[in-house]
């Protein structure tokens, strides 16, 4: 992969900022190849060719539709299950499907150790406690770190029955055209487009890269600043060290805006470990940087059962 491939990946979100809302990378299905081309300096045809290549390589195998748990009156918590033997991770990802309320899991490696991060719903305290106990039983070491709250921007509107129907169609057909969605819910394309845009804009739902996609060769670099350090000055220094820097949005990593003051985070290429190590050392030498931590994504899995059951119940009862 080259810098243009990474730039295209970055601008799958129109603002060029990366978000992970308890899932894989959030993308905007409305972003066109032409809009990406304007950001990365290629022709529209060139962007389309690059997207096809990334898809053929397995990095962009498709999208999934995620529904905001807040529309069901729930929130998300995250816990970490330590992994000592690499062979323990694949069966654990499969077994997590047995735990009601688990929606996503990611196998990660960071400066400290390897773990599977498990994202699950928090609806009532007893339910959260029960799910955490089940995770402990599945954990290869019998240990679970957490859970801790994982903040996602709440949905800003009340959904109508038509909204729920469009959300169902969009979840069933995450890559369908607006005309296809309109046909599925028996409304005009204009109505379907308007409603879908409202659902996306109010964060009732979003698109994410499919969990069948290969992990991009990227590392999450989390940087803690010293007290009094100026973030913009540090960012300018980072740009000279990491030519490819995909900033994580303030609302994109599970912390509410304003709660992570003094922390900068972004994705950087990890194809060359020695180059990444050198970049981290140079990052630590920046005036105002207290620490820097790398996290690598090794794999992930989605678990749709809880969301699908909640959505079916809403469709049965919506007026």
Identify the residue ranges that each predicted region occupies.
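A compositional/biophysical signature of low hydrophobicity enriched in polar/charged and small residues
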Residues: 1-319
